[in-house]
Amino acid sequence: MNKLYELKVAKITHLTTSSVMITFEVPDLLRKVFSFEAGEYLTLQQTINGEKVRRAYSICSGVNEGELSVAVKRVPNGVFSSYATQELKEGDTIEVMPPMGSFVFFYDIFGNRDIMLFSAGSGVTPMMSIAKTALAMTQIKVVFVYGNKSKEETLFFDEIEALKAQYPERFKVHYAFSQEPWGDHYTGRINDKIVNDLFDKYKDFNWGRYYACGPTQLVKDLREMLLLRGIDKDRIFTELFEASPAEADYSQLQGNVEITLRLGGQTHTFESAKNQTLLSSALMRGYDAPYSCLNGVCSSCVAKVEEGEAKMAKNETLSEKEVADGYILSCQAYATTDKIKIKFEN
């Protein structure tokens, strides 16, 4: 269930001085495996300096384009991002998991209504996939709000401008530059004043869904702004592009727990310390449990508690209903009972 496929890097495109777009060559036999919904992400794995490093990156290509690409922005002390932006070459291979994620563009009743996309920094990556797909495959309007420090640090700037020229009536772009004003676009970070102005400007649009992706605080603030406007929470989709601090500390738990793990059609039972996350307990024993970011952001490690109880150090991915139904982020979950049974699902 946690299968990795070796894909060749077909093309590397430099987006800014610190970011690249990686386009993979997908063999015909794997086309179906790597078909994706706009907004999904890929988990990449590479051996760097003798260690296997795994990271999640959102797909930035549109469903309509027939390509599979992700964008990577170098971050301070980022092992994988430094490798991808400075060492990776065309023709190299990377191990890649099939697309996954719940931050996607839906083709249902709300999929026929206009959408508003909020992003900041590298949070624009899934928005590019959603915007390109919506513009090419539907007739809805897309309001695209993108915050960054300056025009020079804006990922996909030329492509965004080209889409704006291609769809002048349906693609409305608004930048918010915090450090360098540009044209008649907003100055400063995305805030309630900007959000209110956009709703006034596009009051005649037939709104369906709202998407927000970027730093934790911005995404939380945007969600609250939208809820205060009376927008149903089921029409607001969010994804975080940075890990937030833990909300609770369970690393001081005492004693051991008997863990029964259902994974890939097999059942394993073993004992572990309660002060280790359920995911780390499984990985330390060589079980191929699914994971990617290890920070409670990507949701690759979701499992369901079938018996016993667990508490999460933080959760900004699962809904209240999912938690009530027994789902956990295993990289953040600690057993609080002496026995626990969990199942990793596809």
Where do the model's predicted regions map?
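Short histidine
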Residues: 146, 176, 264-268, 273, ...
